[in-house]
From Swiss-Prot:
Subunit structure: Interacts with hair keratins.
Name of the gene encoding the protein in the UniProt record: KRTAP6-1
Function (record text): In the hair cortex, hair keratin intermediate filaments are embedded in an interfilamentous matrix, consisting of hair keratin-associated proteins (KRTAP), which are essential for the formation of a rigid and resistant hair shaft through their extensive disulfide bond cross-linking with abundant cysteine residues of hair keratins. The matrix proteins include the high-sulfur and high-glycine-tyrosine keratins.
Disulfide bridge partners, by residue number: none
Annotated organism of origin: Homo sapiens
InterPro entries: KAP6
Protein name in the entry: Keratin-associated protein 6-1
Family, as annotated: Belongs to the KRTAP type 6 family.
A Gene Ontology term for the protein's cellular component: intermediate filament
GO biological process, one term: keratinization
Coiled-coil intervals: none
Keywords assigned by UniProt, alphabetized: Keratin, Repeat
Length: 71
């Protein structure tokens, strides 16, 4: 599962939010920044690492604001 997306929503560089234990989030190929933003079934648009962040990652929420490649 992807847990919750509170971490990304508020832009906190945390862990165990979107993707952790599910799609990975930061560095894993499917995490936020290297593929599908949070990958929580929705808002999977890639974010932060070369893709932007708010604009692509679910209307400003999903992967922080400014960067979505938190490890």
């Amino acid at each position: 599962m992807c847990g919750s997306y509170y971490g990304n929503y508020y832009g906190t560089p945390g862990y165990g939010f979107c993707g952790y234990g599910g799609l990975g989030y930061g560095y894993g190929g499917l995490g936020c920044g290297y593929g599908s933003c949070c990958g929580c079934g929705f808002r999977r648009l890639g974010c932060g690492y070369g893709y932007g962040s708010r604009s692509l990652c679910g209307y400003g929420y999903g992967c922080g604001s400014g960067s979505g490649y938190y490890y």
